[in-house]
């Protein structure tokens, strides 16, 4: 198993991190029963150290927020220069820094059995991990961090550098008298692994995964430089715009002001069968839980309030293991599909325009779609791959552009989410909503940090764009004839016709382009 990730640390504000670009090579490890016991003991020691440091960090954070200095700083206006100075003094006074909590973690390690299992650098990185969790909570970037239980244990450990602690030496991992050899890809037909192993190792990370109810251990080598791009993944130097939805993506690309390609796709289209299996197992688990604990439920089927004692049968635990495996498969499938789709997008263009969306809002309003399709994860993968290929993902504000409500003739009509087609009553243009928004996004320009739509350029390119948008919708209709497609595509049940059925060509006049154009729709 070979996984390559890319991380551009140029965008990180942490001054302690290296500012050079890095990428990750993940390799499975050959682990004996004895090695597995040692690794599990070290991960358990790290879990207990993490909980100890996290508890101390939350305690210091609580005392700091209760102090009079902190309350006074909060009462100051945001533009007051003394505000940040007082906050900084409070942090130093209550020892709520990464260095102070690393020192506390080192004392905990040296005062108990943890020192027999963890080296200094690994303990310091574990303490830093706990501090960052508390710091995110301090800045309201996440909720209150939870302690790691045995059932949700710590599954990764890393070192600070390749000089000590977890080290990659020659062709194996060395860690406190523990030597672990990886399983290398002997074929390596794209040369990705060979390129990675020739790069400088910054530090190493040990990962524990549960696959098919068995523990597997992997090493992640954080390497300096850029990963090798596979020869089959071609990169285009054109420009494109994408319109992202909770479960769909629309793309329109152009080359030298000539519209080149367009498509409308669904994220992870084959995830439906996995979701069906997950639902079946969840229903079976619920039935088992109700039969084993009849006294814990009210007459209407709801769970009783208060402290309850639950009994779980062996059958329930087996179903729980199957459910966990299905979720792992779904996550791996989703990540693979997003990587493939990102490569397809980059084969169309490496300069990609996109609306700046709130993916947290997607989570609140379309929770199931986001859980299964993860549009925010796709954008992060696309951004990483685009930067690696020398391109960029440019996000523009939706407040001034309003692409889903705007026509190229200048008419602005607010549409409901259920209205999936753009039909302009003034110029007569009809197009699928997502595709048309992606088309207009190609002509968004930045004027003094204000994004606006260049209507004249959009009108000039419409003659070449309309046939491509029609072709993209024709492909969607062909797919809809064989399987169900998302409702957001705007393809109704009557449009899911067999390919032999005739199509109706509707002639209309396009007012802004002053010529006759045709629109093909299924009868």
Task: Give the location of each predicted region.
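A generic secondary-structure signal for well-formed alpha-helical elements
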Residues: 50-61, 134-141, 248, 289, ...
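Stable alpha-helical structural segments in soluble proteins, enriched in small hydrophobic residues
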Residues: 53, 125-137, 435-445
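Acidic carboxylate diad motif detector
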Residues: 78-212, 372
